[in-house]
From Swiss-Prot:
Name of protein: Cell division control protein 45 homolog
GO biological process: DNA replication initiation; double-strand break repair via break-induced replication; mitotic DNA replication preinitiation complex assembly; mitotic intra-S DNA damage checkpoint signaling
GN (gene name): sna41
Taxonomic source organism: Schizosaccharomyces pombe (strain 972 / ATCC 24843)
Subunit structure: Interacts with sld3.
Biased composition (Acidic residues): 153-170
Amino acid sequence: MFIKRSDYASAYLKIKEASVSGGCTVQLFVALDPDALCACKLLSTLLKGDFISHKIRPVSGYRDLEQANKTLLEQNEDIKFIILLNCGTMVDLNNYLVSMEDVSIYVIDSHRPHNLNNIYIENNIFVFDDGDIEEDMNKIHDAWYAFNSHELSDEENSDSSNEREEEVEDDNRSVESYSSSDYQARSRRRFSEETTQRRAEIKEKRKKRKEFASILSEYYEKGSWYGESITNILFAVASMLGREDNDMLWLAIVGLTCLEIHCQSSKKYFNRSYSLLKDEVNRLNPSPLENQIVGRAHGKTPHDQSIRLEDEFRFMLVRHWSLYDSMLHSAYVGSRLHIWSEEGRKRLHKLLAKMGLSLVECKQTYIHMNMDLKKTLKSSLKRFAPFYGLDDVIFHSFTRTYGFKCTLSASDVSYAISALLEMGNTGVLLQSKTVARSPDMTEEEYLEKFENAQNQEWLHNFYDAYDALDDVDSLERALKLAMHLQRAIVRTGITLLEKRAIKTLRSFRFGLINEGPDLKIFMHPLALTKMSLWIAEAINEQEREFGKLRHLPLVLAAFVEEKNRYLIVGTSTSAFTSNEDDDDDDGHGHNRFGVAFQEVANMTSATLQMDCFEASVIECQKSDLGVFLESLSFKTLL
């Protein structure tokens, strides 16, 4: 079943009512992505405020979810609610979670498409609707109910019915010699009319069933896309309860921004959410009157944690990096200036020179730049950036002040927590150092040991990021980590483009990362996805300059030596066009790689593993990569 937006508060109050008796009644399963992290923090704040005991368990994939569910919930009679954050809506949860009649399962997930069994079967599974189920899926709703109706399902037995009819005809013929000729004629005529009518009914039912099946297949085969930020959904819950505050508002802003910078936000949902959050910022953070301004700078006080609307540059971490590095490592600027080439870097230098900025000045940390130059930077960019294809270099965003310590933008925090999820506070990949292989260990035993160590490391990273959300010192340290990651992405991307290592196949482009100093970084799906987005945007912009409007999607693979597998990510071209063009009825552009990966898995003998909550991520045995790519090249990906 699904929960309408107007019923969010009622759904939460049921949790509160069930927790009166005490005990740990709520279990949270949280995907390892930034939006789910922010949503978990916000929901945990709500639950703590109502003194509701709960457990938080990050999960890395479907197998981990299934195993955690069995371990934590079997023989645990206290649990009354399971809440899934950014995981679960795309699969039939009855196949993954322990079924208990007195346990309600809440699914709050931005991944699409929904598994229709979760939202239409009346059981203990409740999917939070961001509006698309109620508003956009009426045709799907009617088709699902009709397809699964008892009346149409009877048609499946039509073949056996026909056989029985033929048997009756044989019986009729066997008694003809004992009947009068008049009786025989009437009997045959009556039976013929009934048979014709029955067959017509069966044919009509079969036709309707095929029509409904086609509608349902079309829904699933469109590929994967994204709905509203789940942090925004939970902020709506807090607002309905009258519990919203600045901390929750900031989490909602960061959650939305995370989707935007990872190309997972549709124009439809982003504009709607931005408008609502903008109103909340103005309501909860009124501008101080002139005679009320105290403190040293712009009305700041040591305890000021206000949120402000502010125009931002599409330069990564510009407040904390040098202006030059921020522009050089920005995907937006880099793709349009072609910074992977010497000519592209010269274009960047010319742009800075036209704005009156020397390279020496630009390579200083931004906060140490000349104040007059910083004041004129916005007007200079508006004047000169369009000549270099940077038409949208300035966009509306939010910042938060942390007393006299620092000011962070929503994108700063998004990059920071994303880096923590990928690498943790230590900034190293622990499993590459700690997983040793003994001589008597089989391949399967070592693989299991490595995957367990990897999952434990990712869980540790999750808690590092979770704690950093309310610790500005940890966030500032994580900014350095985000810079390190972005340098690795740009460095690797430039290498692939310079070597012309991105090959064009029948229906997609393909790139392979199987060596290099940064290979270990791309063992994490989130890091490899960022790398894929950077390369795809660079190629698409290059083609757009030559007038090509239809671009091929990109498949990027990174070799994981310990597993002897390739981690593979499929990036759709719509990831970049959806924010510029009008969205379709389903919001964000569709990525068909999940559907294609599943089809390849079903039709080949290649050893593949689809365990990630992102449908466009898959693992392939090293020896099967060629078979996998050959089969994939015949699939429709656009």
